Every structure is written in C-alpha cells, then in structure tokens.
Amino acid sequence: MNWLLRKCSKCGRYTLSRDRCPYCGGELIVPHPPRFSPIDKYVEYRLEEKLSKGIIKLDEKPPYKP
C-alpha cells in the first residue's frame, strides 16, 4: 500500500515529503503499523526468535492458578 504520510526519525515531525525531513534533514519512516491478519505467516519465526533471546520461557509455570 502506498502511504503518503511520513515521520521524521530525528525530530518526530510529520510530513508529506518522501526523501528527507524539510525541517531537520532527518530520515523519514512510515508511521503506520503493519496490517493485521488472523492468518499470520510469520508467527513461528517470531516465537522462535523470542525463545532464543530468552524473552519467552516455556519451561516456567504460569503465575495464574485456577
């Protein structure tokens, strides 16, 4: 999808320019989040990455006890 709005990574201002920020000359990024899909093709890769970095640990007991 072709987004028009851009955000400067340096100063945080929004602009319609596509190359550089007209205020500070910083790099522009697309501020829109990625589309959500219930059929996620990359969930396995994200889970594997989080497990390898130790963000998620599957061997721990959950804190909730019914």
Curated annotation (Swiss-Prot):
Belongs to the NOP10 family. Involved in ribosome biogenesis; more specifically in 18S rRNA pseudouridylation and in cleavage of pre-rRNA. It holds the Pfam family Nop10p. The keyword Transmembrane does not apply. It comes from Desulfurococcus amylolyticus (strain DSM 18924 / JCM 16383 / VKM B-2413 / 1221n). GO terms for molecular function: snoRNA binding. It comes from the Archaea. This is Ribosome biogenesis protein Nop10. InterPro entries: H/ACA_rnp_Nop10, H/ACA_rnp_Nop10_sf, Nop10_arc-typ. Keywords: Ribonucleoprotein, Ribosome biogenesis, rRNA processing. GO terms for cellular component: ribonucleoprotein complex.
